[in-house]
Structure formats: structure tokens, C-alpha cells
């Protein structure tokens, strides 16, 4: 009987010692926070640029919810390696170095995810071009190393590698190769002149002509740092 009581006391003491350790481990987890920024997902690799401070984080997604949200946000014309605007709940596990390894975001939940536009992106860009008949748009961003072309007419997207433009007078010309098919080249000519997209009452300061092979698209453009077009 004495042995039984002694064994019971030992088990109780062990249990009391284990529970605080478990609680302490849980208390060391980073708090859950809300992060707003630009999320990029490509072939299972995901990263996040924080709009609050510009920090670049890798993402760990145990919820497995990012691929579906990301694909939906990119529609109707997904470009390879494009970023989307996202608000997420996550724990930030800090890395070893603020510059080279700022940390990892462990996703808890996706609050929202939507397509990128000139109003919501916080990654620097040079031009945003758009046209109608069919509807299309192109974002030009040295920071994202690409020209992202969305053709809503046939619901296709292409990413062209960024290269320095050539400027002459009021004309700026980009020549870029398709990231997925380098034999395909895009030539994009931007001219500083009044432009209308033909459908809305918006007035732009730049006209745009895009050539890919034998196909040509015409439209208007917005330059970063200049006022967003308004109706006359």
C-alpha cells in the first residue's frame, strides 16, 4: 500500500512538472498579427512583401489555402510569377538577419486576396498600361523584374523579363523576352501625349502600342509618380 501511494505521488509530481513546460513552449510562440502586402506564389514557393515596412518574408502555409486564393485573385488572365494584394493573419518567426533573412510568416488565415492594380500595390512600378477591344493591361516593374501582360480577351497572361528601356524625345521603348518562351519578344512603345481608352471618360498622358509577333494592341498608360487619370 505504501509503495502504491509513493508511486502515485511520483506520477503527480511528474505531471505537475510537465504541464508548465508545455505551457511555456506555447507562450513562446510569436503572437498572431495581421499583415498587408504583396504575395507571390510560383510552383509551391511563396513569399510576401510587407507593405508596412517593405520587409520580404518567406511563407509557411500549413492551412494549404494559398494556392486556391492566389489562382482566383489572378483571374481572368494569370501571369507567371505575378504578385497579388493580400491581407493575412500569421505568426512572424524572425530570421537570423534583418536584411538577408528577415523571417518567415506562418499563415493562420487568409483575410482577403485580390488582383494587383496601381492603387493597391506597394512594390515600385514604372508604368501601368491598359487598353480595350479586347481588354488588356501591362504592369512594368523593374523591382519585380518583369512586364506582366494580361489579355482578358483570351484569358491568357504572359510575363516578360524586364530590361532597360530606350528613350528618345517623348518616346520610351521597352523590348522584352517572354520568361517562359524566350524566343517570343514584346516591343512596347510609350509616347507622351494625350490618350483616351475609347470607352471611359478618363484622359491619360501616354499612348501605348504593344507588339508581340504579328499581334498589336493599342491603349493608354499611367506613369508612376504622376496623377492618376481622371474624367474630364
Q: For each of these PLM feature ranges, what is it?
A:
Residues 93-120:
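OB-fold/S1-family single-stranded nucleic acid-binding modules
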Residues 13-15:
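C-terminal motif of bacterial Sec signal peptides marking the signal peptidase cleavage site
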Residues 46-67:
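OB-fold (S1/OB) nucleic-acid-binding surfaces
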Residues 17-19:
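Bacterial signal peptide processing site
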Residues 35-38, 43, 116-137:
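Tryptophan-anchored aromatic micro-motifs
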Residues 29-49, 90:
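Structural detector for short beta-strands of small beta-barrel domains
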Residues 56-62, 136-189:
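Central antiparallel beta-sheet cores of small beta-barrel/beta-sandwich binding domains
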Residues 37, 75-103:
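Flexible glycine-rich surface loops and low-complexity tracts that mediate binding to linear polymers
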Amino acid at each position: 500500500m505504501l509503495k502504491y501511494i509513493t508511486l502515485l505521488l511520483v506520477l503527480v509530481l511528474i505531471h505537475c512538472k510537465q504541464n508548465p513546460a508545455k505551457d511555456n513552449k506555447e507562450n513562446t510562440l510569436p503572437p498572431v498579427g495581421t499583415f498587408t502586402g504583396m504575395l507571390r506564389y510560383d510552383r509551391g514557393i511563396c513569399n510576401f512583401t510587407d507593405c508596412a515596412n517593405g520587409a520580404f518574408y518567406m511563407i509557411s502555409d500549413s492551412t494549404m489555402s494559398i494556392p486556391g486564393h492566389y489562382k482566383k485573385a489572378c483571374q481572368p488572365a494569370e501571369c507567371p510569377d505575378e504578385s497579388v494584394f493580400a491581407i493575412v493573419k500569421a505568426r512572424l518567426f524572425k530570421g537570423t538577419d534583418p536584411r538577408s533573412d528577415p523571417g518567415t510568416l506562418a499563415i493562420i488565415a487568409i483575410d482577403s486576396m485580390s488582383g494587383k492594380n496601381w492603387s493597391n500595390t506597394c512594390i515600385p512600378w514604372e508604368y501601368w498600361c491598359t487598353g480595350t477591344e479586347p481588354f488588356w493591361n501591362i504592369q512594368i516593374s523593374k523591382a519585380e523584374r518583369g512586364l506582366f501582360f494580361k489579355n482578358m480577351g483570351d484569358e491568357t497572361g504572359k510575363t516578360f523579363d524586364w530590361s532597360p528601356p530606350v528613350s528618345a524625345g517623348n518616346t520610351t521603348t521597352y523590348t522584352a523576352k517572354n520568361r517562359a518562351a524566350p524566343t517570343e519578344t514584346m516591343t512596347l512603345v510609350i509616347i507622351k501625349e494625350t490618350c483616351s481608352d475609347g470607352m471611359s471618360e478618363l484622359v491619360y498622358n501616354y499612348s501605348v502600342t504593344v507588339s508581340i509577333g504579328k499581334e498589336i494592341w493599342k491603349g493608354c498608360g499611367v506613369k508612376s509618380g504622376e496623377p492618376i487619370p481622371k474624367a474630364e
